[in-house]
C-alpha cells in the first residue's frame, strides 16, 4: 500500500470539510510489472494515423513515467497537428485531454499549451457547454464526462471557471450522470476527480468561494462516491471492466467518504490484472485509461511544474523494442446476425473475418445495403462514435444516441473495440438517455 499526503489545512472552519484520513492506494508491485506488458503492447502496436487515441496514450504513459521514445515522438507529432490544424473541431473534453497530456510534468511540449493559448480556448469551450445547458434543459454540447475533464484541466492549469457554476451543475442527481436509469461510473469518477481538485484550490486559496460552496462540493463528492461504490461487483470490478480504472482513481482521492471495508482495493486490482491477461484491453484508449490506477497514479498527480519521472527501466522497455504480434487465424470467417432498430427492425446476416470488431460488421452491412444500413461516424479520443444511421442523427440536446447491443444487452465497449463472436446477435438501436 502507498501513502499520500493530506491537503494543507487553512483555518478551523475549513477543517470539517477536509478528509481526515490518509488516502490509501493499492498498486501493482514491481515484481508484477510483467503483467502490465499486454497494456503496453496494445499501445505500442496500435495505429495512430488519425491521432485520436494518441492523447490518451501520451497522458497515461507520461503520468506513470514510462518513456518509449519513438512511440512518444510519433504521438506528440499527431497532437501537434491537432493543435495547429484542427483545434476548432475538437470537443471541449478532447481539448482538456490535450492540455493534460502536454502538461503532465515539466517538458518541452508544455509550451504548446501557452503558445497556442489552449487554456483560453478551453475556457471558451467550457462556457459554450454551460450556455448550451442553460438553453437546452441542462444538456451540455458533449456530455458530463467531458464537462468534468474541462473543470479538471482548468483547475490544474489555473484557468478561469466559476465555482458557482460547478456547484450549480455538478449536483449528484443531475440527469447527465445517467444513461437511462443506469449511473455512469466513469462519468461519476471523473466528476469526483474534478470536484476534488476544485476543493483543493478552494482550501489553498487559489480560487475564492463562500463556505457554502466548499460544503456543497464535499456533499456532492460523498454522494458520487457512494454511487460509484454501489456499482461494485462481487469480483471487485466497478461498473464494468472499462470503467474500473477511473473508478479506482476516484476512490484513491476520496477515502474520507467511505469506510475501509466498503472497498477491497486489492481485489479490484487483482481482477483487473486477470482481465488484462484475458485480452480485455485490446483498445489503446482502454489500455491507457486503466494503466494510471494500476500504477497508483491519478489525474490529480499531474503537475506542470514538477520534473517528469521515469519508470521505463523497471519495465525493461527499449525504445525500439520489436513487439511480436500474434496474427489472427488465416482466412477464418465467422457469421453474425446484425440489425438496426428505429421504429421497426431491419435484419441481415454478415460474414466477417474472425477477430473483427463491431464497426467492421456495420461497414460490411453498409456495403450490402447502403439505404438500410448506411451510417456515419466521428473519430473521437475514445474511439469511433456512431453519429447517424439512415440519416437519423444522434443529438445531445435531445439526448438521443445510437446504442450498441449484443443479445439485447448494452455493450460496455465501443464499435471500434468490441470483438464480435460467431453466431452473435448484434443490434444498433435508436435510444434516449
UniProtKB/Swiss-Prot annotation:
<keyword id="KW-0170">Cobalt</keyword>
<dbReference type="InterPro" id="IPR002157">
    <property type="entry name" value="Cbl-bd_prot"/>
</dbReference>
<dbReference type="GO" id="GO:0006824">
    <property type="term" value="P:cobalt ion transport"/>
</dbReference>
<comment type="similarity">
    <text>Belongs to the eukaryotic cobalamin transport proteins family.</text>
</comment>
<feature type="signal peptide">
    <location>
        <begin position="1"/>
        <end position="23"/>
    </location>
</feature>
<dbReference type="Pfam" id="PF01122">
    <property type="entry name" value="Cobalamin_bind"/>
</dbReference>
<feature type="region of interest" description="Globular C-terminal beta domain">
    <location>
        <begin position="333"/>
        <end position="433"/>
    </location>
</feature>
<keyword id="KW-0406">Ion transport</keyword>
<dbReference type="GO" id="GO:0031419">
    <property type="term" value="F:cobalamin binding"/>
</dbReference>
<dbReference type="GO" id="GO:0140313">
    <property type="term" value="F:molecular sequestering activity"/>
</dbReference>
<feature type="glycosylation site" description="N-linked (GlcNAc...) asparagine">
    <location>
        <position position="369"/>
    </location>
</feature>
<feature type="binding site">
    <location>
        <begin position="142"/>
        <end position="146"/>
    </location>
    <ligand>
        <name>cyanocob(III)alamin</name>
    </ligand>
</feature>
<keyword id="KW-0964">Secreted</keyword>
<feature type="glycosylation site" description="N-linked (GlcNAc...) asparagine">
    <location>
        <position position="349"/>
    </location>
</feature>
<feature type="disulfide bond">
    <location>
        <begin position="26"/>
        <end position="265"/>
    </location>
</feature>
<feature type="binding site">
    <location>
        <position position="186"/>
    </location>
    <ligand>
        <name>cyanocob(III)alamin</name>
    </ligand>
</feature>
<dbReference type="GO" id="GO:0035580">
    <property type="term" value="C:specific granule lumen"/>
</dbReference>
<keyword id="KW-0732">Signal</keyword>
<feature type="glycosylation site" description="N-linked (GlcNAc...) asparagine">
    <location>
        <position position="216"/>
    </location>
</feature>
<feature type="glycosylation site" description="N-linked (GlcNAc...) asparagine">
    <location>
        <position position="337"/>
    </location>
</feature>
<feature type="binding site">
    <location>
        <begin position="385"/>
        <end position="386"/>
    </location>
    <ligand>
        <name>cyanocob(III)alamin</name>
    </ligand>
</feature>
<feature type="region of interest" description="Flexible linker">
    <location>
        <begin position="311"/>
        <end position="332"/>
    </location>
</feature>
<feature type="binding site">
    <location>
        <position position="240"/>
    </location>
    <ligand>
        <name>cyanocob(III)alamin</name>
    </ligand>
</feature>
<keyword id="KW-0325">Glycoprotein</keyword>
<dbReference type="Pfam" id="PF14478">
    <property type="entry name" value="DUF4430"/>
</dbReference>
<feature type="binding site">
    <location>
        <position position="289"/>
    </location>
    <ligand>
        <name>cyanocob(III)alamin</name>
    </ligand>
</feature>
<feature type="disulfide bond">
    <location>
        <begin position="155"/>
        <end position="197"/>
    </location>
</feature>
<feature type="disulfide bond">
    <location>
        <begin position="105"/>
        <end position="308"/>
    </location>
</feature>
<feature type="binding site">
    <location>
        <begin position="402"/>
        <end position="404"/>
    </location>
    <ligand>
        <name>cyanocob(III)alamin</name>
    </ligand>
</feature>
<feature type="binding site">
    <location>
        <position position="411"/>
    </location>
    <ligand>
        <name>cyanocob(III)alamin</name>
    </ligand>
</feature>
<dbReference type="GO" id="GO:1904724">
    <property type="term" value="C:tertiary granule lumen"/>
</dbReference>
<feature type="binding site">
    <location>
        <position position="433"/>
    </location>
    <ligand>
        <name>cyanocob(III)alamin</name>
    </ligand>
</feature>
<feature type="glycosylation site" description="N-linked (GlcNAc...) asparagine">
    <location>
        <position position="343"/>
    </location>
</feature>
<feature type="region of interest" description="Globular N-terminal alpha domain">
    <location>
        <begin position="24"/>
        <end position="310"/>
    </location>
</feature>
<keyword id="KW-1015">Disulfide bond</keyword>
<keyword id="KW-0171">Cobalt transport</keyword>
<comment type="function">
    <text>Binds vitamin B12 with femtomolar affinity and protects it from the acidic environment of the stomach.</text>
</comment>
<dbReference type="GO" id="GO:0015889">
    <property type="term" value="P:cobalamin transport"/>
</dbReference>
<keyword id="KW-0813">Transport</keyword>
<feature type="glycosylation site" description="N-linked (GlcNAc...) asparagine">
    <location>
        <position position="354"/>
    </location>
</feature>
<feature type="disulfide bond">
    <location>
        <begin position="388"/>
        <end position="393"/>
    </location>
</feature>
<feature type="glycosylation site" description="N-linked (GlcNAc...) asparagine">
    <location>
        <position position="160"/>
    </location>
</feature>
Amino acid at each position: 500500500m502507498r501513502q499520500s499526503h493530506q491537503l494543507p489545512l487553512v483555518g478551523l472552519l475549513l477543517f470539517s470539510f477536509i478528509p481526515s484520513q490518509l488516502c490509501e492506494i493499492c498498486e501493482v508491485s514491481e515484481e508484477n510489472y510483467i503483467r502490465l506488458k499486454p497494456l503496453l503492447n496494445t499501445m505500442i502496436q496500435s495505429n495512430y494515423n488519425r491521432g485520436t487515441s494518441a492523447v490518451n496514450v501520451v497522458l497515461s504513459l507520461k503520468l506513470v513515467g514510462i518513456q518509449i521514445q519513438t512511440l512518444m515522438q510519433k504521438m506528440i507529432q499527431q497532437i501537434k497537428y491537432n493543435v495547429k490544424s484542427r483545434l476548432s473541431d475538437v470537443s471541449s473534453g478532447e481539448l482538456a485531454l490535450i492540455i493534460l497530456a502536454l502538461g503532465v510534468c515539466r517538458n518541452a511540449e508544455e509550451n504548446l499549451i501557452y503558445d497556442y493559448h489552449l487554456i483560453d480556448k478551453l475556457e471558451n469551450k467550457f462556457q459554450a457547454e454551460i450556455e448550451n445547458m442553460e438553453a437546452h434543459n441542462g444538456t451540455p454540447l458533449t456530455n458530463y464526462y467531458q464537462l468534468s475533464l474541462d473543470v479538471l484541466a482548468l483547475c490544474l492549469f489555473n484557468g478561469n471557471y466559476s465555482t458557482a457554476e460547478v456547484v450549480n451543475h455538478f449536483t449528484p442527481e443531475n440527469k447527465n450522470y445517467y444513461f437511462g436509469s443506469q449511473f455512469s461510473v466513469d462519468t461519476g469518477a471523473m466528476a469526483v476527480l474534478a470536484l476534488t481538485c476544485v476543493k483543493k484550490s478552494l482550501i489553498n486559496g487559489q480560487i475564492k468561494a463562500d463556505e457554502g460552496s466548499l460544503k456543497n462540493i464535499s456533499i456532492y463528492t460523498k454522494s458520487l462516491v457512494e454511487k460509484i461504490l454501489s456499482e461494485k461487483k462481487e469480483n471487485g470490478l466497478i461498473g464494468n471492466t472499462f470503467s474500473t480504472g477511473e473508478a479506482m482513481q476516484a476512490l484513491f482521492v476520496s477515502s474520507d467518504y467511505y469506510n475501509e471495508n466498503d472497498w477491497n482495493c486489492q481485489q479490484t486490482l487483482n481482477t483487473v490484472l486477470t482481465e488484462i491477461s484475458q485480452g480485455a484491453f485490446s483498445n489503446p484508449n482502454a489500455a491507457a485509461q486503466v494503466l494510471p490506477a494500476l500504477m497508483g497514479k491519478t489525474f490529480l498527480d499531474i503537475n506542470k511544474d514538477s520534473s517528469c519521472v521515469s519508470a521505463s527501466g523497471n519495465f525493461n522497455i527499449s525504445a525500439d523494442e520489436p513487439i511480436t504480434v500474434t496474427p489472427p487465424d488465416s482466412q477464418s470467417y465467422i457469421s453474425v446476425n446484425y440489425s438496426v432498430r428505429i421504429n421497426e427492425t431491419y435484419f441481415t446476416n454478415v460474414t466477417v473475418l474472425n477477430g473483427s470488431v463491431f464497426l467492421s460488421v456495420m461497414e460490411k452491412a453498409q456495403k450490402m445495403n447502403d439505404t438500410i444500413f448506411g451510417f456515419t461516424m466521428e473519430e473521437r479520443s475514445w474511439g469511433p462514435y456512431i453519429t447517424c444511421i439512415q440519416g437519423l442523427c444522434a443529438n445531445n440536446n435531445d439526448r438521443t444516441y445510437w446504442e450498441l447491443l449484443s443479445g439485447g444487452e448494452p455493450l460496455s465497449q465501443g464499435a471500434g473495440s468490441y470483438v464480435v463472436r460467431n453466431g452473435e446477435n448484434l443490434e444498433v438501436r435508436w435510444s434516449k438517455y
